[in-house]
Amino acid sequence: MISSKASDYQQRIGYVFTDPSLLLQALRHRSAGTPHNERLEFLGDSVVNLLIAEALFQRWPRADEGALTRARSELVRETSLASIARTMQLGEQLILGPGELKSGGHRRDSILADAVEAVIAAIYLDADLATCRTVVLPWFETALTALPVGKPEKDPKTRLQEWLQARQWSLPVYELIFESGDPHTKHFRVSCTLGELKLRTEGEGSSRRLAEQDAASHAIDQLDSNK
């Protein structure tokens, strides 16, 4: 039986489930027991990549493969999916175990992004690909239209490196602060240090690479604010 809170949430995401248990599974983190959302996350990752690839292919008829790939990566990266989750207030709906609740798991990018993918898979399984496309693509519309046609924004590490190289300054140094979690729920915190600028930022993510991107993004924000 689905709760009234989850029932209301279906209206927010724009889809009412025939099988509400799929939504409940999509919202249940592995820390809260089974059935949890990891299998749905696996499927949802492929579905969202297909939907975004298809949308970009149709909207950018002159873009080459490289531009399309970079654009898709920008739209489906962890921070982008987590932003969608926050817009939909998905964190408030997550079913988490006591440990994740205590540590603020409902605010963590990796958990939010995984849940978005799981919800997408749940919609796909409950209906079909066409319905999933109709429901899900509007979630990405703002980000899709914001991308410069054929020239998606480079990732934060590349942008930061190019900014420093243009000024002939040393490249940033990334260091692992800590990692936690089991192999399926790893969490990383990384620092980014700019020696000449005496600037140090930190970032988090479900992989070291994502944590470094997050730290670089924070460094760019700091540099922009100091202009």
From Swiss-Prot:
Keywords: Cytoplasm, Endonuclease, Hydrolase, Magnesium, Metal-binding, mRNA processing, Nuclease, RNA-binding, rRNA processing, rRNA-binding, tRNA processing. Its EC number is 3.1.26.3. Gene3D superfamilies: 3.30.160.20, Ribonuclease III domain. It catalyses: Endonucleolytic cleavage to 5'-phosphomonoester. GO terms for molecular function: double-stranded RNA binding; metal ion binding; ribonuclease III activity; rRNA binding. Its main location: cytoplasm. One of its GO terms (cellular component) is cytoplasm. This is Ribonuclease 3. It comes from Xylella fastidiosa (strain Temecula1 / ATCC 700964).
